[in-house]
């Protein structure tokens, strides 16, 4: 799903592998931002030991594509994951939200 807001596009893209991350970056670099929900992410994203979350977040930061991650309850994934969410509370490129509406509002700003 794509939403256009004042020359910005917000894309909803599933990211379950490194290839998906690269495809998402290629599709949106310079043209938009991405919102993902828990259902759009693989289980490895929530297990920080796999490195998948770090790779995903770092690529979005490096390529300056804004990413909003929607999670109903970040605490459900453990203390370390909750710390990651808190660390990104004011981040300029990657943030976590409890609702897709809040995520899209931030991406549109």
PLM regions: where:
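Amphipathic, Lys/Arg-enriched alpha-helical "gate/interface" segment within cytosolic domains
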Residues: 2-109
